[in-house]
Amino acid sequence: MSDSASISSGIADRYATAIFELAKEENNIGALEAGADLLDAALKESAEFRDLISSPVYSRDEQAGAIGAIAKKLELAPMLSNALALMASKRRLFVLPQLVASLRALIAEEKGEMTADVISAQPLSKANLDELTKVLSASADKTVKVNATVDNSLIGGLVVKMGSKMIDTSIRAKLNALQNTMKEVG
């Protein structure tokens, strides 16, 4: 991990822990989870939002005003909207994607759940997703929430990341392994 990624992750983890502890104190983890989901969806859907949080062109006041409007529009819980306002005033909004990921991890841990990131070459059907969720839950002895994404470059197969484990059954990985083997022989 690069130094800047490590620093960003550290900043996001500190904010996430503080927000999570506050939500836990107020018995408001459900609202925090809903807010994290809304922020994640907004980040994925809006290029302007991603630009706002990462571009140095916007001033603190512009970022604070925009993030306040977004928090109001999304009807985020006060603890989350206040944290976003603080992050804007400190020019820390660039860690928002990592913050959302950290919040989700803390919430999942609190609920005894685990998140699995599944990358497939083609979209998984509902039946495939349900079966995969069931198998992963059985292997982890926890409730598993699956985040499914599509990456056509895999050619076929799946890449499953769950906790510190990664299983790569993609055609791309097998072709790369074959290529490396052929380099060693030749």
UniProtKB/Swiss-Prot annotation:
Chief place where the protein resides: membrane
Localization, UniProt: Cell inner membrane
Source organism, top-level taxon: Bacteria
Matching InterPro entries: ATP_synth_OSCP/delta_N_sf, ATPase_OSCP/d_CS, ATPase_OSCP/dsu
Keyword line: ATP synthesis, Cell inner membrane, Cell membrane, CF(1), Hydrogen ion transport, Ion transport, Membrane, Transport
UniProt-listed Pfam families: OSCP
Membrane topology recorded in Swiss-Prot or TrEMBL: Peripheral membrane protein
This protein's record includes keyword ATP-binding: no
GO molecular function: proton-transporting ATP synthase activity, rotational mechanism
Cellular component GO terms, alphabetical: plasma membrane; proton-transporting ATP synthase complex
KW Coiled coil (keyword) present: no
Coiled coil: none
Family: Belongs to the ATPase delta chain family.
Subunit structure, as described in the record: F-type ATPases have 2 components, F(1) - the catalytic core - and F(0) - the membrane proton channel. F(1) has five subunits: alpha(3), beta(3), gamma(1), delta(1), epsilon(1). CF(0) has four main subunits: a(1), b(1), b'(1) and c(10-14). The alpha and beta chains form an alternating ring which encloses part of the gamma chain. F(1) is attached to F(0) by a central stalk formed by the gamma and epsilon chains, while a peripheral stalk is formed by the delta, b and b' chains.
NCBIfam families found in the cross-reference section: ATP_synt_delta, PRK05758.2-2, PRK05758.3-2
Function, in words: F(1)F(0) ATP synthase produces ATP from ADP in the presence of a proton or sodium gradient. F-type ATPases consist of two structural domains, F(1) containing the extramembraneous catalytic core and F(0) containing the membrane proton channel, linked together by a central stalk and a peripheral stalk. During catalysis, ATP synthesis in the catalytic domain of F(1) is coupled via a rotary mechanism of the central stalk subunits to proton translocation.
PANTHER family: ATP SYNTHASE DELTA CHAIN (PTHR11910)
The protein's name in its UniProt record: ATP synthase subunit delta
Record organism: Dinoroseobacter shibae (strain DSM 16493 / NCIMB 14021 / DFL 12)
